[in-house]
């Protein structure tokens, strides 16, 4: 079998295995992302695997450069990638995308043991507290009224009288229609 046939078979297998799995994303027929960890988990990370033309005889390209991984230090990313590269060397020549995703899921705690999510959120909190005082003087300015376009003003004028009030009875219920829906007293 050629490399393309192996890739087609693995692609079909990945689609059937991860069908309905929200953590898996197929970016293209040769590029895949998998989120390791649940939504809201501070130790969750995203792995992207892209196949080369001669994959699986040559190793795939593994990346952690997604925006999702911005809170993870580069040292932790490098250690995860190094451990995944070891798994690639073991599985070279076979379909390994599923194996790599499962390996990462099984070893998530070990991979992220040096990741400290609390330390990465501190600078963000400092940025927010620095911006808060600068927002206070702007609130002292007069609040402008909402500006309406001509079409919005015309529509509002059509609905209301010249004083801006809604006409009498605008929300009244048609009595006959209401009674026909609710039925008569004798129907009980």
Swiss-Prot record:
Domain of life: Eukaryota
Annotated InterPro entries: RWD_dom, RWDD4, UBQ-conjugating_enzyme/RWD
Domain (RWD): residue spans on this chain: 9-111
Amino acid composition bias (Basic and acidic residues), ranges on this chain: 155-166
Gene3D superfamilies xrefs: Ubiquitin Conjugating Enzyme (3.10.110.10)
Residues covered by region (Disordered): 132-167
A Pfam family of this chain: RWD
Protein name listed in UniProt: RWD domain-containing protein 4
Gene symbol of the encoding locus: Rwdd4
